A protein has these predicted regions:
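Surface-exposed aromatic
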Residues: 297-316
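N-terminal secretory signal peptides that target proteins for export/translocation
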Residues: 1-8
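Bacterial N-terminal signal peptides
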Residues: 11-23
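Hinge/capping helix and adjacent helix->loop/strand transition within the periplasmic-binding protein
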Residues: 30, 68, 91-102, 112-203, ...
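N-terminal (or domain-start) structured segment
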Residues: 28-127, 166, 174, 187-217, ...
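C-terminal lobe and pocket-closing loops
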Residues: 137, 221-290, 319-322, 334-335
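Solvent-exposed alpha-helix faces
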Residues: 56, 97, 160-161, 213, ...
Length: 335
């Protein structure tokens, strides 16, 4: 019996060693080919614009020609827009492989709010996705066309109270940050506006610039790049933003719209991706986000950075899940 135990012990030890060596090999070799990142919004929008910047240094090499971040492999952005992100995220969860070569950009509160409001319609939630790292936090801003009669939030609110349901506001989709900001504004100001969802921030911006809607909520970074063609009335955050220092927060105007709609952006993998692969990504991706060239390019584009580690994002996701579940009980309108 003792000889059998000895054989089993040696076999187990050999198996454990083999597993350890395999894990080490994965960490040493991954990635061996380009990585794709799905962006669930259209080309030219804030998420697409920023995703291309924060991943542009993926294949960077040092002066000696050694890979700095992801083994010298590039990241390729794949746009799959539609339904405020639902099309891209649903396809990612249903079709991608959990191997670390197919990743996706996340938007919070968007995907979390949608998983709460549409649990049967969407396939994604915080349980079947794995955060890697966060690169930015983009507040929602209330915008109107340069030719609009509204020069302030007070003008906007006064008109809305005198004309219930007449103001149309565009946004990037249902239960994305823009929609949440719109619902908060209606409740806090005691007004009724009509929210017009679109396929993403680019289309929502076009609605405002083209006069199809009277105003809209959009990303601060998108508004910043179009600031010569817009009036930016207020920012839905707790503090003014350094890129638009003259734009007040709703809070300072006496309207209780907080930072619930701030758009956190980052990269995620599928649940089930091997731990060694997750570890490589969790180590290298935040460093890539913090690259000096990335930071400079993001600042040039008026894109607020907020780099967070995997552990920090895991905590943020759980907190937002709990918070949004409560918030949407009060804000949700019947669809």
């Amino acid at each position: 019996m003792s000889s059998i135990n000895g054989i089993l012990t040696r076999s187990f030890a050999a198996g454990a060693l083999g597993f350890s060596l395999c894990a080490g090999a994965v960490m040493a070799e991954y990635p061996e080919r380009p990585i794709s990142v799905v962006v669930s919004y259209g080309a030219g929008g804030a998420t697409d614009f920023q995703a291309r910047i924060v991943t542009m240094m993926a294949a960077k090499e040092d002066k000696e020609g050694k890979p700095v971040y992801l083994n010298g492999q590039p990241i390729v952005i794949v746009n799959r827009p539609g339904a405020g992100g639902q099309v891209g995220w649903n396809k990612f969860v249903e079709q991608a492989k959990p191997d670390g070569y197919e990743l996706a950009a996340y938007n919070v509160p968007h995907f979390i709010a949608q998983s709460i409001v549409f649990p049967k319609k969407v396939k994604y939630n915080i349980d079947n996705l794995e955060p890697i790292a966060n690169w930015g936090a983009d507040p929602a801003v209330l915008i109107v066309n340069q030719d609009s009669e509204f020069n302030s939030v007070q003008d906007f609110v006064d008109y809305a109270k005198a004309n219930p349901g007449k103001i149309t506001l565009s946004g990037a989709g249902l239960y994305v940050g823009h929609h949440i900001a719109s619902l908060q504004l209606d409740k806090a100001a005691g007004i009724e506006t009509k929210y017009v969802p679109s396929s993403g921030g680019v289309k929502a911006m076009q609605f405002v610039l083209g006069g199809q809607t009277m105003g809209g909520f959009n990303n601060l970074s998108d508004a910043y790049r179009n600031r010569d063609r817009l009036k930016i009335l207020a920012v839905a955050d707790l503090e003014r933003n350094e890129f638009l220092p003259d734009v007040p927060t709703f809070k300072e105007l006496g309207i209780d719209v907080d930072d619930s709609s701030v758009n956190f952006r980052g990269i995620m993998a599928l649940h089930g991706t091997p731990d060694p692969v997750i570890e490589v990504l969790a180590d290298k991706v935040p460093a890539m986000f913090n690259d000096k060239k990335v930071m400079a390019k993001m600042e040039e584009g008026g894109s607020p950075m907020r780099v967070m580690s995997r552990a920090e994002v895991q905590k943020m996701w759980k907190e937002r899940q709990a918070y949004l579940a409560e918030l949407l009980k009060d804000l949700r309108k019947e669809d």
